[in-house]
Amino acid sequence: MPYRLDITQGDWPGDLLHKGVEGLLAEAMVLTLATAGHEHGPHANLAFYAHDEDLVLYFVSERSTRHSHHLAEEARAAATVFLPPPAFGEQLRGLQLTGSAGEAWGRQAEAALAAYQGRYPSFAQDEETRRQYLTGGGAAALYRFQVEELTAVDEPNFGRRNYLRARVVRGW
């Protein structure tokens, strides 16, 4: 387990929370990323994502988008990942994430591409497209979101309205 979750709110064992977070990230496919910039104000967008064993989420975006401009100005970001509930008011399952995000370069780009292709095997199959993502030569780029803190709600597993908040600890 390359990262540990230190629970700051709630009363659930950390290893079970870790398992729940990993399960939810594996089951969901899209995140909502929230950014803010000095000129354009707050913004939210959707992106397909992949994640690695260090709780880093990777996504692809055009450099021309508002959120990409925001991340170039300010790395702080928030995201949500959730599964649709079966009915209104029942069985909420999701994560609220805060951390830092930005373009992935060098080894980070290699890790991003490996994670993304691991989840979406048809992504960037030709050598030229892979090279553009790894060198930053295209209109689109690989981005990384390093989760620093999370709030989890998983009513089927943790109970109704049991919000668990945790800090992500790496390199322990």
Set out the residue ranges of the language-model regions.
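Short acidic (Asp/Glu) patches
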Residues: 62-65, 78-84, 120-131
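Charged, gly/pro-rich active-site loop segments
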Residues: 1-15, 91-172
